[in-house]
Amino acid sequence: TSIIVELESGKHDILVEGEQNDSPTLYWKKVTDETVFYSPVAQSLDYTVFAGNAEEVMASYRETTGPAPMMPIWALGYIHCRERYNTQDELLENARIFREKGIPLDMIVQDWQYWGKYGWNAMRFDEDRYPDPDQMVSKLHQMNIKLMISVWSKIDKQSDLGQEMNNKGYYIPDTDWIDFFNPDASNFYWKNFKEKLLPFKIDGWWLDATEPENDDLKNRLINNGTLPGELLRNVYPLYVNKSVYNGLRKDDPLGRRAFILTRSAFSGIQRYGTATWSGDVGNDWESFRRQITGGLGQMSTGIPWWTYDAGGFFRPGDQYTNTDYHELFIRWFQTATFFPILRVHGYMSNTEPWRYGDEVENIVRKYLDIRYRMLPYIYSESARVSFNGSTLMRPLVMDFSDDINALEQKHQFMFGPSLLVVPVTESNKSSWSVYLPENNNG
């Protein structure tokens, strides 16, 4: 349970009562407005208390769990993604159109299944559709566009790489997920990553489904059969990202800063050059509103780099002609302009802005212009994130703790110390009420 309390000076005791046979439970205590989780898996409980205002608490937390390294500046621009480009030519053609139209773009993303006939996440490009990945990356770089690709911690056991992994006993039992808790498995994964993917000089890495997706680890022993999987399941994404980040810092051929997008996280993951996003979400207004509050909640956990799939991951079948959806997409995009990371993505969708008509394209262009005009501010604030333990996207309570009404603002937030962001979260609105928080310090 997390709770904000004011304590008088002196000694305070915390009493925790637990039973060996408790079942994992998550519930809301209406009387005290608390969310409570308890689990029989943990063998002990440790409490750490951070004192000070919100900024001081966050800085202390990062000092304890590790500072967030500086993001490359291009990671703070526009990242364009869709599910998915199917060929090398298709990806390059869309990148060229961005440049021809003068729509700002820093990074384009190749989602899953570029491995084709070689099997899931075989760490190879299927040359039938991607005949020359090295040339593909080179052409993107000539256009001053970076490339990110999707890489999983799941590997097809029938692939050449999967057979090697399986023969060495590097899988979590009865799954296709690599046992990153086993140092030998983690090192072998990185060895293949380094040899098969790093030579292409790809810029960013999308570690998808790092929960791991769909497979419970209960009754599955990990780390060479020495630990129960359910004990450390939630820590899995931390180990995956640690392996890749440390490898990139050691072996990247150009010595570049690492940028990793991971779907799942754990305390301290910010020290591995990661950003997270809210996963495969819907596209309706309620989903949009929930993403904002969810993102602000994530900011409050000390993980500073976050985004969502602007426009929603699952989209309506008539998305290109549906004007109601166009309005909604615009609101998603406008709001994401003031997120730590700005990214569009969509399931089975050609998400390029020109596919939605001139009006949507022009509004996207306008807000990208705003984003890039803000980039010196964003980059300066990102330095404060790294060196001072600051937070870029901030719930109002972080800056206006004396204003009780600020705590009730679910969707308004500060973007750095200077910008108050007020998303429009309902349809057919030409005006919108803004809450201006009280600041007793002027």
Regions found by a protein language model. Name each.
Residues 1-442:
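Catalytic-domain carbohydrate-binding cleft regions of carbohydrate-active enzymes
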